């Protein structure tokens, strides 16, 4: 079975809480605060495993959670950092945010890894909050919260050459002839419902991987049939071999088939459409009118496709020359990473300092991830904490922005469920 998509839930570890503690030793008066910091929460990290070839494991386990950080303690003891959780994925895995469908990472090399959920920062102990005017702070920061999200994993085949074409044109037969792959072969449409891979060995030439991409039909670029799933597998190939049934035994016109498949490629991705393409006019052993091939070749060449081979996968006629041309083309094309456009790329929000302010009547509402983190870190009922809270708002520019918006004495400022009256 070839599983090429999976959806999993990942959750990093929460940061450990800072400690509120004071030094208590005989003969040492006013020992001062000695609460240690909390440990950092563990990250969730996706790591490429070159030995994995499918996403099948993720059908059995779908939720992954890293260790939280340990809490701080007295005597300035710091909490233990939580262990990172490493999740192995196959090479060629695309990571997407499940909510936005934006691409987060392209794990295409053996050494690639990606932190998909960052552990929360450990909270500061009260020994961190001493100042010349605050010698005995009796508050500490709780650990920062964990990150959690659903992500989608897509495995895109790392094949060098992709066999494309309508169903039942002989792609699977060709793959079985040029490699040791044994795909299912039968005389009906959509025999191949999953991509098959094979390795082609040519004496004196580097081996290359060839993939039989399941049949693409009209409307594939719009999701008709299994179209989008099939087209996804073609993206990483460097050379395409477009297999055409030149015999027309099913009543289809070879040139019309050629145009339709290329139109679907173009609609899906112009870059995919522009990829080097070799035309393989297959089933020539069943062709009784040689002029039909020459006519087809002339029409195709007008579109700029000058590599047209007459082959028969069943009798192996012309197959060796076809594979040698594919190898020659590959030697001229560098392996490149999948290009990700800015609109498709997932932008990691800088969560710590993100906020917005809006006004409703005489109430100014401050909201955002910065607010959530700040309120999580302080006890607004404690005078020391409250002074620290106002200092942070001032340092981060919140107070200045409120004044620029025209806030006046007595106006209410609301941060989540906490409100206070503004005073100049």
Swiss-Prot record:
In what residue span(s) does the OBG-type G domain sit? 159-331
Sequence positions that bind Mg(2+): 172, 192
Q: Which InterPro entries match?
A: G_OBG (IPR031167), GTP-bd (IPR006073), GTP-bd_Obg/CgtA (IPR014100), GTP-bd_prot_GTP1/OBG_C_sf (IPR036346), GTP1-OBG_CS (IPR006074), GTP1_OBG_dom (IPR006169), GTP1_OBG_dom_sf (IPR036726), OBG_GTPase (IPR045086)
Q: Name one Pfam family in it.
A: MMR_HSR1
Where does the record say this protein resides?
A: Cytoplasm
Q: Report the protein's function.
A: An essential GTPase which binds GTP, GDP and possibly (p)ppGpp with moderate affinity, with high nucleotide exchange rates and a fairly low GTP hydrolysis rate. Plays a role in control of the cell cycle, stress response, ribosome biogenesis and in those bacteria that undergo differentiation, in morphogenesis control.
List the HAMAP family hit by this protein, alphabetically.
GTPase_Obg (MF_01454)
User: Of which family is this protein a member?
Assistant: Belongs to the TRAFAC class OBG-HflX-like GTPase superfamily. OBG GTPase family.
Q: What is this protein called?
A: GTPase Obg
Q: Which organism is it from?
A: Clostridium botulinum (strain Hall / ATCC 3502 / NCTC 13319 / Type A)
